[in-house]
Amino acid sequence: MKTACFPVFRNRLPDLDRDLDRDTKRVCGIKLTHDGAIAVVEDGRLVFCTEQEKRNNNSRYQEINNLDAVVAALAENGVNARDVDQFVIDGWDGEAESRFKVLSGETPVILRGAPYVERHAEGLLDWIGGSGLTLGDRVFSYRSYPHVTSHVASAYCTSPFAKSGDPALCLVWDGCIFPQLYHVEGKRASFVKSLFPVTGQAYAAAGHYFGPYKQTSRGGWDLGVAGKLMAFVALGSVHVRIVAVFQKLYQEHFAGDTALACAFRANINNSESSLAAVHDFFAASALQLGQRRPKTCLHRLIFSSNVSSLTKWRTLQHHPLPGARNLCIAGGCGLNIKWNSALRQTGLFDSVWVPPFPNDSGSAIGAACCEIVAQQGFVPLDWSVYSGPSLQDRQVPAGWHASPCSISEVAAILASNKPVVFLSGRTELGPRALGGRSILAAATSPEMKDHLNEIKFREHFRPVAPICLEDRAPDIFSPGTPDPYMLFDHQTKMPWQDKVPAVVHLDGSARLQTISRNSQHKVAEVLVEYEKLTGIPLLCNTSANYHGRGFFPSAAAACEWGRVEHVWCDGMLYRKPSATA
């Protein structure tokens, strides 16, 4: 079968005064590789973002290997590809450009895109263009910006700094790069510095050598391991001797003047060789540490390097950049709530913003934002976290009883210590369930955490997050500040650790999500009604999905899964035959 291959062209930063660019109204961003997604921005407003893992019980991190998925996502949201003014493909691995092999229907297509990282300090908005995006029976031109640019754009444009027009720093730490610091102001963004020479994939790679996910092979990359290890570190403690081993090997392999370290830094844009170097580091660590369990020590060492580098940079800066006390965090490492919280607590920044999709689940949004930024500068995006796919209308399995059910009745079921699959409105964006595709449960018994982990086939040490009314959070948690996207760590205050044990992690922390009691989302109403019945303003909140797959796309999918007896979906309650109300 013949492969369609189309010419590409390159350009530098577009002329911001070009009339052609100013006429662009509807932009479609596409992320083809893992965490594949399609997003449409129209007149500065996010219309929708369809992450592939959230369609049809697809596998987590689902890529787009057939461009028919783009056509389908557009059609599901009432958009014809011909009505899109500009398509933008997120860049990927490659020093000069990336290359994507996909299908359009049954026809193989090769698309070329921008590289992973900008090629010079002012090159974030340098783009590569092509004309081979085959959607249905039509071929469209497209642009592609560096992958890192999409992280910067999605983080800043969704931030409060963009709304107020204030400059900010943006820290991007992704799988294949060192933590990179950028400065965003007005119509420009520029690279400031790399903080230290450790790639984001190091945290997950450690799982091949230490802890419950240890394996003998270097293959079989699991994108979910990093998050699981974030929970696992609560089982350990810091040991000076173990940290010393890591520090010594860190200098030898990554940061020092050895031939090994210099070669690693020189070849950072080669993803295969950089990953091999990370594996070599952990293999050497495992050999020296033997049976000792160093995961918590590694976590502490990497974070200390981050803070130390930021502090040193701030101290040595003779001419402070505007907005240097505002920080956006993006990249896959932005999902690490321990690091996010510690950065927020350093005192280096007045305000820290992490979007609900800091990892590649936000890259399609970021790709669309890149085009807006190229035209207008770093303007704010009008967006909602509940902009994913709508619920599908499918027939539930035979035997399930369906009846109308009010929010107060849902609260009563929860107060009787029965979990409820809660499906409402459009899917939330990003990897965290935020009340749109959640399993809710009372947090008043420690057994509930074990039960939720069991029905979801999760390890016993995995935490269950609380969703709490915003105005009550400071009573229960420290700091208890508003955190609507579950991306920071909070300590549970002692009087409440016995009241809500199901949401207290092994180290006393909680991955808190707050929501205003005046929110229009139905999950806020549930919390208000539950508080009236019990005096407790929070519930357990964990994602509603098959193990290893995206959120349930319908009530029917939740019933087919069948591991929770009550499924509530936009006003209807579905009960398993054996269940009691």
Curated annotation (Swiss-Prot):
This is Nodulation protein U. GO terms for molecular function: transferase activity. PANTHER family: NODULATION PROTEIN U. InterPro entries: Carbam_trans_C (IPR031730), Carbam_trans_C_sf (IPR038152), Carbtransf_dom (IPR003696), NodU/CmcH_Carbamoyltrnsfr (IPR051338), Nodul_NodU (IPR048155). It is an enzyme of class 2 (transferase). The keyword Transferase applies. Pfam families: Carbam_trans_C (PF16861), Carbam_trans_N (PF02543). Involved in 6-O-carbamoylation of Nod-factors. Gene3D superfamilies: 3.30.420.40, Carbamoyltransferase, C-terminal domain. Disulfide bonds: none annotated. Keywords: Nodulation, Transferase. Belongs to the NodU/CmcH family. One of its GO terms (biological process) is biosynthetic process. It comes from the Bacteria. Its EC number is 2.1.3.-.
